[in-house]
């Protein structure tokens, strides 16, 4: 699941690498137009579930419908500090499958690490690509 889908590139990458289904959520109508166009260009629309909702509402709906995820990718706009709340809701609603992972893309790795200290997650990898930092998380024990 790509919670802040933007162009849909991450969800499309998941699908191109064999994921059975990719949820791509973004609250921006403009972003969703790009996601739809990009998914059509790649001919992967059959397995793409595109949702135009705020992340909080989408996570609530996923819980209500019993949907769980193996991989959850979070790349909220860098100027919004909402990863901590998204992770909190994902854990609270039990949306991560056993052995599932959360990947956070951020421009401020130290802030995200500090934010995650209160969760039941452990950082098992992190990588830096230019300005972007990727933090890979899994539930402890």
Regions found by a protein language model. Give the residues of each.
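Class I S-adenosyl-L-methionine-dependent methyltransferase catalytic core
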Residues: 1-141
């Amino acid at each position: 699941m790509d919670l802040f889908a933007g162009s849909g590139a991450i969800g499309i990458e998941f699908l191109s690498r064999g994921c059975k289904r990719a949820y791509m959520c973004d609250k921006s109508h403009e972003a969703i137009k790009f996601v739809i166009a990009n998914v059509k260009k790649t001919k992967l629309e059959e397995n793409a579930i595109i949702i135009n909702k705020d992340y909080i509402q989408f996570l609530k709906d996923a819980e209500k419908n019993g949907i769980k995820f193996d991989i959850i990718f979070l790349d909220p706009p860098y100027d919004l500090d909402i990863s901590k709340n998204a992770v909190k809701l994902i854990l609270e609603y039990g949306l991560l499958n056993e052995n599932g992972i959360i990947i956070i893309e951020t421009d401020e790795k130290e802030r995200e690490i500090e934010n995650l200290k209160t969760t039941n997650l452990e950082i098992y990898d992190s990588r830096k690509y230019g300005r972007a930092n990727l933090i890979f998380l899994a539930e402890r024990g």
